[in-house]
């Protein structure tokens, strides 16, 4: 850059700092690059598929899927993991359906969890914004976007038409709170439901509620589905779950993770650790027997997972080995989940910002 341009730039930067404050414009090279802080999801496979070890702080995340697919369970698992790190969490229960007893079984400290059950969508989003601006909250879950009913719709008659009200509400709210979320380094998770578009001939007819604003403002979008049942004999004790990372602005997108959710217990982490440890050679499998460092730890996956539950030090050591190997920059995370075909709508929004 020639001297005249340097002088002009210095004058402009000086004027900007005087008018808007120091740090309004910064040179990227003047500061060390720092890894984006993340909060674990409670699923080792999903943490690895996300590329940074969990959900990013200071960002908006959308989790959507069909009914009974595990959306609320996954968010409660995130809250439980955050609380273990000493974080303060809030749950905005717009659906008025949070079960404290179930949350406690998943490891959530319900005594310290802040809960709000707002009457209208405007109230829910205003409460969310105020909690973010307090700079004292680390994780906020909004359950769900579909239940954020505008005040005009609640006060109107049952058959009244309110076209686009919820979409406008979400768009306005997200414009307002996005900057605050970054400044507060707070993770905000929106749970969303699926609807069907009428008359779609080609492509997926599925869409999410609340308009398109959330799709663009979200740094991470997770599509969670129930793929099967977990049985003990004839009794169904849980569900097989698949999560696709359909948008990721902090790591490569389109990874997927598969894990089990056990009823009344949550994500089956020890089972995941056994599977991944075998896949990457940390645990040896011979027939039905599993061995770790030359010693047998159990016959069958269930017994091996029970051994890890009874020996938390070995469990933590195995988990650390897996994380160190798969979350090292440059390591291909396809070992956990492959790239999956996603809807064209998701492809168009999946910006990558590494």
Curated annotation (Swiss-Prot):
Coiled-coil boundaries: none
Domain of life: Bacteria
Assigned GO CC terms: cytosol
SMART domains, per database record: AAA (SM00382)
Binding site for ATP: 65-72
Function per UniProt: Can catalyze the hydrolysis of ATP in the presence of single-stranded DNA, the ATP-dependent uptake of single-stranded DNA by duplex DNA, and the ATP-dependent hybridization of homologous single-stranded DNAs. It interacts with LexA causing its activation and leading to its autocatalytic cleavage.
The protein's name in its UniProt record: Protein RecA
Source lineage: Bacteria, Pseudomonadati, Pseudomonadota, Gammaproteobacteria, Pseudomonadales
